[in-house]
């Protein structure tokens, strides 16, 4: 039986109260624990972070820097403790910046690859980022494409990922990136398939992605940004006052892709990000996320490797 360690992250990348900062609590309240009843589940004391700030920080130039730095440190510690103890960490809530804690911490214990499932490539350079949100930049920081002028403890752990240790499924942000003259990782040698390709053959491409990752490391981490979904399928993504990128995967396509990926073996943990309970008053989206978790965990082999 897989032993699961839940890691709820009460962080909002814009420093807001509510929104993504309460996503973990909303998912717990919508039956996340019950969905994992077939597993041995542990969860440590609730994570406590500094009060959110909407100012850019002096070390990273990113918004909500004090909470970001504390969060990445805590997430990294909890994830590595879980993996070392033979448990499967499920990091839930917050945004994609949790990867700035997870990947460097895992890297310290040996090679690790990343399957990144997201509607955006998240490689916005720090000097180009118009809003200073870490979750627009984290993949570029992990790869060392940006962040050379950062200071402090986070900068000391970066870069932490090679281009051949990354596979990306689902982006649909070409138009947005072009506004800032930011190229695609696909053009620089990263294994990537966009949302239309994934929608056509989700299982095949997910398996191919994992096979690519396992050429470079036996262990790989799964990260899912739920904005890979079509906003008509999942409205509680993005910012309340900003139009979401149209199109994206259906729940069925995402489930099929993730199920095929984890069934391939080698997945040592999973982060699930970008859910805004403030845009989900009846919690129907939260309940759908919980169903996704249950479906994917069922496909996980009894041993991670």
What does each model-found stretch correspond to?
Residues 163-165, 173-175, 216-220:
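Aromatic-lined glycan-binding groove of carbohydrate-active enzymes
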Residues 84-156, 161-165, 264-265:
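Active-site histidine-anchored catalytic micro-motif
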Residues 150, 170-177, 249-254:
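A general structural motif
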Residues 7, 94, 117-119, 169, ...:
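Active-site flanking residues adjacent to catalytic metal/cofactor-binding acidic residues
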Residues 124, 175-177, 278-279:
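Active-site environment of divalent metal-dependent phosphoester hydrolases
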Residues 2-90, 102, 184-305:
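Catalytic cores of soluble, metal-dependent hydrolases
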Residues 116-119, 143, 165-173, 194-196, ...:
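Short, structured patches in soluble enzyme cores that scaffold and shape functional sites
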Residues 175-186:
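Short, glycine/polar-rich helix-capping loops at beta-to-alpha or helix-loop-helix junctions
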């Amino acid at each position: 039986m897989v032993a699961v360690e839940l890691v709820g992250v009460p962080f909002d990348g814009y420093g807001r109260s509510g929104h993504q900062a309460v996503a973990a609590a909303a998912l717990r309240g919508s039956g996340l624990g019950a969905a994992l009843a077939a597993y041995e589940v542990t969860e440590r004391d609730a994570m406590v972070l500094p009060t959110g700030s909407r100012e850019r920080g002096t070390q990273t130039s990113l918004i909500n820097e004090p909470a970001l730095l504390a969060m990445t440190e805590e997430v990294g510690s909890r994830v590595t403790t879980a993996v070392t103890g033979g448990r499967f960490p499920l990091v839930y809530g917050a945004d994609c910046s949790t990867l700035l804690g997870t990947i460097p911490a895992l890297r310290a214990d040996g090679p690790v690859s990343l399957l990144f499932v997201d509607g955006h490539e998240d490689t916005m350079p720090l000097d180009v980022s118009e809003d200073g949100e870490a979750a627009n930049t984290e993949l570029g920081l992990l790869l060392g494409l940006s962040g050379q002028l950062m200071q402090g403890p986070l900068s000391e752990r970066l870069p932490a990922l090679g281009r051949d240790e990354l596979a990306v499924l689902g982006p649909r942000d070409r138009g947005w990136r072009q506004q800032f003259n930011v190229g695609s990782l696909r053009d620089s040698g990263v294994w990537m398939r966009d949302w239309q390709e994934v929608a056509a053959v989700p299982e095949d491409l997910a398996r191919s992605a994992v096979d690519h990752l396992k050429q470079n490391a036996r262990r790989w981490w799964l990260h899912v940004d739920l904005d890979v979904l079509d906003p008509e399928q999942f409205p509680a993504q993005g910012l309340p006052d900003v139009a979401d990128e149209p199109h994206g995967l259906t729940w069925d396509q995402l489930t099929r892709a993730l199920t095929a990926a984890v069934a391939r073996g080698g997945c040592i943990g999973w982060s699930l990000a970008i859910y805004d309970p403030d845009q989900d008053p009846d919690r129907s989206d939260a309940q759908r996320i919980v169903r996704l978790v249950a479906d994917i965990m069922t496909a996980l082999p009894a041993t991670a490797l």
